[in-house]
Amino acid sequence: MKKPLLAALATLALTGVGTAPAVASSAAPAPAAAETARAVSFAGTVSLSNCSGSVVRLPASEDDDPALVMSNGHCLETGFPAAGEVVVDQPSSRSFGLLNASGSRVGTLRAGKIAYATMTDTDVSLYQLTSTYAQIRSSYGISPLTLSDARPTAGTAITVVSGYWKRTYACNIDGFAYRLKEGEWTWKDSVRYTSACQTIGGTSGSPVVDNATGKVVAVNNTGNEDGGRCTDNNPCEVAENGTVTVRQGINYAQQTYRIPACFGLDNKLDLSRSGCVLPKP
């Protein structure tokens, strides 16, 4: 996983190795590839205490619905969910720094609850805010990003937008991992980036935006840092026939197109809805 930054800093203090890029990168220039994706801005992205995220709406969301913030399951303030664990409707008062198009913080949003979170099959957290989309737009002039309900395709030009670092990473979808295994967790049908997206610690939870549509197609979550095989911070790809592939320096995201089917009226989570395949508690 692209470790939450606080954990990465703690590891660095103890060991002096392993997570230095998460610290050093604050002064590093943005990747040159980002120059090709200027149309994708920071508007609607958020910074968490340890990760990145975004204010998102579903295709059927209405302006008076409570807004949602999406990040990774491993970015929860309560720690990493165990394999098989699903968090639903858990109270939360977490705060998020809302960014405008240029990456400046324009306000603070607050959660009322964790609507859904897991690290099983996918790595996602969805917070329900105390504000509606209309209230956010009225107060800050910021609209949410829209989650696509269509599966992305290989070759798609994408931008990973980190609200924590206020940096973007532009590349393409290289392909998909049938299973991506990291430590005790396994994720399905993960997005593999081309090598240009060198995401770092703190970019966890960043929205992955389809440059052509402007819609969110995935949430950034991990990468193989050291060439390890299926260990923490060193995920491996497992093919349908069981073949294991390690791609050192390659980073990954989890697809989000299945999320809209699990929410109904008023942005209310309903895991029993037809077409909803997210893991259940």
Task: Give short role names for the model-derived ranges.
Residues 40-42, 47-51, 135-142, 167-259:
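Active-site region of chymotrypsin-like
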Residues 1-28:
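Secretory targeting and sorting signals
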Residues 76-79, 224-226:
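Short glycine/acidic-enriched loop and turn motifs that connect beta-strands
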Residues 244-281:
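PDZ/PDZ-like groove recognition
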Residues 48-50, 64-66, 70, 91, ...:
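Extracytoplasmic
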Residues 60-67, 210-215:
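A glycine-centered beta-loop-beta connector
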Residues 31-42, 47, 57-61, 77, ...:
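Conserved catalytic-core segment of clan PA serine endopeptidases
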Residues 144-171:
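Short glycine/Trp-rich loop-beta-loop segment that forms part of the substrate-binding cleft
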